[in-house]
């Protein structure tokens, strides 16, 4: 498996990163923060250590970053805090809600079931286009010279359930769309 490390510059360090006042007055900040919160909810983010959610200090592009997402999906419970595994914001981007409502179960399984595939050939390993899921019950799968990485069918079902919950709550009027 591969680990990637990328240093983020011009981001907040430490402390509470969610600024409710800014969220209510700056639509670009609100969009970035709401989209990140939707993602952390969908992936069942369970590592709220200080520094795992960062905001850009660039006022013209107030992006939000979530890092160290190793304790997600069906990971065992963590004592690291889980405040971002819930939707904490009250306003969501309409474009994001529309996109979530257009997703089908088939699309989720197709895109998330096999996220990466590798083949061993001639003493080398190469990234190749994903093929049919070898075993939907496992996240890491091997068959012959093929290795696949992706979410399990159970994890994808949990993602689908969380998306449907957001959409249901939206229909009930829980969120203001912008």
Each model region followed by its residue ranges:
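Phosphate/dinucleotide-binding and metal-coordinating scaffold of catalytic cores
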Residues: 1-178
């Amino acid at each position: 498996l591969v680990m990637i490390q990328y240093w983020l510059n011009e981001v907040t360090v430490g402390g509470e990163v969610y600024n409710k006042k800014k969220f209510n007055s700056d639509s670009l900040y609100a969009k970035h923060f709401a989209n990140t919160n939707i993602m952390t909810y969908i992936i069942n983010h369970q590592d709220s250590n200080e520094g795992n959610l960062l905001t850009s200090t660039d006022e013209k592009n107030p992006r939000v970053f979530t890092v160290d997402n190793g304790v997600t999906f069906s990971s065992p419970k963590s004592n690291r805090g889980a405040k971002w595994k819930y939707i904490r914001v009250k306003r969501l981007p309409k474009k994001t809600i529309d996109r979530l409502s257009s997703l089908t179960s088939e699309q989720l399984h197709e895109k998330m079931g096999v996220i990466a595939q590798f083949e061993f050939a001639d003493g080398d390993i190469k990234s190749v286009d994903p093929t049919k899921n070898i075993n939907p019950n496992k996240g890491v799968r091997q068959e012959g010279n093929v290795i696949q990485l992706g979410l399990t069918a159970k994890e994808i079902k949990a993602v689908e359930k969380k998306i449907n919950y957001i959409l249901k709550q939206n229909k009930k009027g829980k969120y203001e769309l912008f």
